[in-house]
């Protein structure tokens, strides 16, 4: 039944800036809300959101954070200004009750436009330290929600709330037998899932493939490589490659025993909620602002994960860290059981309701 309420989501650039929105959208659909989403023209958010029934996707111009000199950097302020004007028109036409932002540079013009339109907005920050897009958006927003309790010290006290990680309910409905069928694995060895982030990782992909002879003695391997990064020349029993997995991910997770992954916040909190021991290989500081290193070290400190820095990644270091992770897995799972993710979705929706009052 329609209730005439409308929520507008934004966020993109990587899957991590979309996942929380994907967790919240079904909640509001079940309650009869109208749902809009503002993203970029060609970002991964378009691929993830456009196929959803009952969600209207709108594209706007957006800038990009580059950690290197480029003439494109000179154009970005104008792209953000154009995106703000586009978002201003969309918000004026769609008249949302509230805007929920998951970050990424596409979100900056949307949150700014919401402020200009007098529409309240809420930002969700997944990482241990706030990203640049969210930092730029904070002055325009009503509330900022933190995934890590430690993040609160980096946020304005009058706007910040700790809510924890919002996990998609569907991830808890996966079936191991379906995951094994999808991947074509037998399940007679521990299943190792390798993920290099939504875009894949050349370094992780290369090291995994170089180590296959030894790794396949101990594991069956599901390797999510990234778009265009599958190596069709490798055909080995117990090893399967995918560019990307979307709807079947819950079943792949259910078939998984151990994970090798980057250390994006949303992904590692999903592994935590599913009690999957993980070896984290965070993006280096040269390739990022260092947020994944901080995320990974936080999980290591809490004994949820083992960490291998990318600069130290070799066949030998990978094999030794995996062996240690495998031995420690029962202890890690016991530690993971102490973490409760069930209250996070409720906390977020209650804050959304309060901000709208």
Swiss-Prot record:
Residues at which UDP-N-acetyl-alpha-D-glucosamine binds: 14-16, 168, 198, 292
| Cellular localization per UniProt | Cell membrane
Q: Name one GO cellular component term.
A: plasma membrane
Q: What class of enzyme is it?
A: transferase
Q: Which reaction does it catalyse?
A: di-trans,octa-cis-undecaprenyl diphospho-N-acetyl-alpha-D-muramoyl-L-alanyl-D-glutamyl-meso-2,6-diaminopimeloyl-D-alanyl-D-alanine + UDP-N-acetyl-alpha-D-glucosamine = di-trans,octa-cis-undecaprenyl diphospho-[N-acetyl-alpha-D-glucosaminyl-(1->4)]-N-acetyl-alpha-D-muramoyl-L-alanyl-D-glutamyl-meso-2,6-diaminopimeloyl-D-alanyl-D-alanine + UDP + H(+)
Q: How does it sit in the membrane?
A: Peripheral membrane protein
Provide the gene name from the record.
murG
Show the Gene3D superfamilies listed in the entry. Answer: Glycogen Phosphorylase B
Keyword Cell wall biogenesis/degradation attributed: yes
To which pathway does this protein belong? Cell wall biogenesis; peptidoglycan biosynthesis
Keyword check for Ion transport: no
Keyword line: Cell cycle, Cell division, Cell membrane, Cell shape, Cell wall biogenesis/degradation, Glycosyltransferase, Membrane, Peptidoglycan synthesis, Transferase
Matches recorded under PANTHER family? UDP-N-ACETYLGLUCOSAMINE--N-ACETYLMURAMYL-(PENTAPEPTIDE) PYROPHOSPHORYL-UNDECAPRENOL N-ACETYLGLUCOSAMINE TRANSFERASE (PTHR21015:SF27), UDP-N-ACETYLGLUCOSAMINE--N-ACETYLMURAMYL-(PENTAPEPTIDE) PYROPHOSPHORYL-UNDECAPRENOL N-ACETYLGLUCOSAMINE TRANSFERASE 1 (PTHR21015)
| SUPFAM superfamilies linked to this entry | UDP-Glycosyltransferase/glycogen phosphorylase
Q: Provide the GO MF annotations for this entry.
A: UDP-N-acetyl-D-glucosamine:N-acetylmuramoyl-L-alanyl-D-glutamyl-meso-2,6-diaminopimelyl-D-alanyl-D-alanine-diphosphoundecaprenol 4-beta-N-acetylglucosaminlytransferase activity; undecaprenyldiphospho-muramoylpentapeptide beta-N-acetylglucosaminyltransferase activity
The function of this protein is: Cell wall formation. Catalyzes the transfer of a GlcNAc subunit on undecaprenyl-pyrophosphoryl-MurNAc-pentapeptide (lipid intermediate I) to form undecaprenyl-pyrophosphoryl-MurNAc-(pentapeptide)GlcNAc (lipid intermediate II).
Protein name listed in UniProt: UDP-N-acetylglucosamine--N-acetylmuramyl-(pentapeptide) pyrophosphoryl-undecaprenol N-acetylglucosamine transferase
- Family recorded in the similarity comment: Belongs to the glycosyltransferase 28 family. MurG subfamily.
